[in-house]
Amino acid sequence: MKILSVFLFVFSIYIFGHVSGTGIRIVNELKSHKNLWMRCYSKNDVIGPKIIPVGYDYVNSFRANIWGTTRFMCTLKQRPNYRHYQNFTAFKQYTAYDNGADWDWRAREDGIYLKKEGGLKKSVDMNKVYDWIN
């Protein structure tokens, strides 16, 4: 009976994480009609490359794993010549209980901004996280 109780507890945590929203959103807020080149990957998935026009976004919802190790890495590049770019961790699960977080990224002229909602860690208001690499 104890094993069944433990199984049901772990299973309910796992299911809860898959019911709530977990994902990344990347928004192109660049000026001068600059498209944004994007490619993201995790241990199991590759997204892109994709081109995001100014004013548009790309949303990827996914399921965080039960081990608490889900991570997405992304590369963003500004068009037309791709001189300005950045490689970064776009989503990181901190524990097996850390499900349901949305990481909202904004590509702007002066850098890349992040707003986090949900998950175990405190929500984060929009703030600049990365500068562009030249």
Swiss-Prot record:
The keyword Ubl conjugation appears for this protein: no
Major location category of this protein: secreted
UniProt keyword annotations, A-Z: Glycoprotein, Secreted, Self-incompatibility, Signal
Stored InterPro entries: Self-incomp_S1 (IPR010264)
Subcellular location: Secreted
Glycosylation sites (chain numbering): 87
UniProt keyword Signal present: yes
Gene Ontology biological-process entries: rejection of self pollen
Stretches that traverse the bilayer: none
Signal peptide: 1-21
GO cellular component: extracellular region
Family of the protein in this entry: Belongs to the plant self-incompatibility (S1) protein family.
Protein name stated in the entry: S-protein homolog 31
